[in-house]
């Protein structure tokens, strides 16, 4: 068994959609990034790539490549899954946390789990997502951005 750790952060800005776990969340701001800036999926992808010693999302989907401009991170997650399978790994589990002062994310977590389960073609009980705040501290607490952390375990076939 191997484990991987992922982390991502993006700045909150006006005139962008807020996408987390492939779910569009109603909010006055969204995350700034080259793709859809889905911090949850970016952290998950980095944890999976790390567990398989396949680098990180910047290596596979560079922000200097216009073909990834505005792309759905669900599509990128599907590509990461193909790489994992090609290299002989099976996902054992994923545990993630989203750190955001606002908006409240609990109502959207199950839909995020469904999206991730579908993109990775794994059972939903292998995916856990939590949401928390930093009690008004730091850049997430002052609502300047949202971050996410993810850990996963994979098994070599």
Swiss-Prot record:
Sites where the protein binds 4-CDP-2-C-methyl-D-erythritol 2-phosphate: 8-10, 34-35, 56-58, 61-65, 132-135, 139
GO BP of this protein: isopentenyl diphosphate biosynthetic process, methylerythritol 4-phosphate pathway; terpenoid biosynthetic process
Site positions for Transition state stabilizer: 34, 133
Catalytic activity entry: 4-CDP-2-C-methyl-D-erythritol 2-phosphate = 2-C-methyl-D-erythritol 2,4-cyclic diphosphate + CMP
Cofactor: record remark: Binds 1 divalent metal cation per subunit.
Cofactor(s) needed: a divalent metal cation
Family matches, as InterPro entries: MECDP_synthase (IPR003526), MECDP_synthase_CS (IPR020555), MECDP_synthase_sf (IPR036571)
Pathway(s) this gene product operates in, as recorded in its UniProt entry: Isoprenoid biosynthesis; isopentenyl diphosphate biosynthesis via DXP pathway; isopentenyl diphosphate from 1-deoxy-D-xylulose 5-phosphate: step 4/6
Residues noted as binding a divalent metal cation in the record, renumbered to the chain: 8, 10, 42
Superkingdom classification of source: Bacteria
NCBIfam families cross-referenced by the UniProt entry: ispF (TIGR00151)
Role according to the record: Involved in the biosynthesis of isopentenyl diphosphate (IPP) and dimethylallyl diphosphate (DMAPP), two major building blocks of isoprenoid compounds. Catalyzes the conversion of 4-diphosphocytidyl-2-C-methyl-D-erythritol 2-phosphate (CDP-ME2P) to 2-C-methyl-D-erythritol 2,4-cyclodiphosphate (ME-CPP) with a corresponding release of cytidine 5-monophosphate (CMP).
Assembly information from the UniProt record: Homotrimer.
Name this protein carries in UniProt: 2-C-methyl-D-erythritol 2,4-cyclodiphosphate synthase
